[in-house]
Amino acid sequence: MPRFDQVISHRFRGFAPHESTLAGLHAALDYGVQQVEFDIRVTRCGTPIVTHDEDASDGAGKRRAISSVMARDLPGLGGDFQRMSHADALLAAVAAHPNRTCRLLVDIKDAGFERAVHALVAKHKLLGRTIWVSWLPEVLYAMNDIDSGVPLCLSHWCQPPGDAVRLKHYVFTAEGGRIPRPERRLVHGERSGWFVDGPLRGELRDLVSWVCVPAKQLSRALVDDYHRDATQVSAFSYLSAKAMEDAEARFGHDAFFSDARQPFEVLHP
């Protein structure tokens, strides 16, 4: 059975009625959760906010791109927007909370804003508790240039994504497991990622200390390959402690993204 501290609260799901909210963060920290993950996107004015998708519904049900709205307008847009927190406010809440051992997996969805996000985490003295996560190699290369040696985690598909995924994502394919430094530096308002046929290779493999892959695409061979150089493997997502237990027995990976509160209740020490 996985340990309590191996479970990652995925967007604070199960701890509040809506994901990625301050209420969910507070509830997860209050419960003693030791790893939380949240996503950062950037508004038109360059403000990092906490949300996963590249767009959201306003109070009238209209979908608006996060990259097209100004941060000052979020509360007035209603709908999903009124629940969105500035990354600065969420990090301040983490820093002020007595749960001082919870690790932060900060998943950056837009590239070209790494210095701003890094500065916010540094402002709240949380760098030592942070793993930088992204589906965008642009983000990870840039973050390593800013702060060499920081923990980096690449999220990637390790089996060919299906039509449903490709409908919503730009899918890039690694050649021979290698993802070289991309020429582009700015990725704003896009949903994209990389398919790596098997384990990562090359420069990016040397830089990352973690990878995150879909739970349904895990294999023992993939995990064993990553473990050869102590690269940690996490998988998303699970709804029960039993599912985590079964997956750990089959694959031997290191961390488990949870979309529910139940695993934390079962595994709480």
Predicted regions and their residues:
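Phosphate-group recognition and catalysis centered on beta-loop-alpha active-site segments
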Residues: 1-269
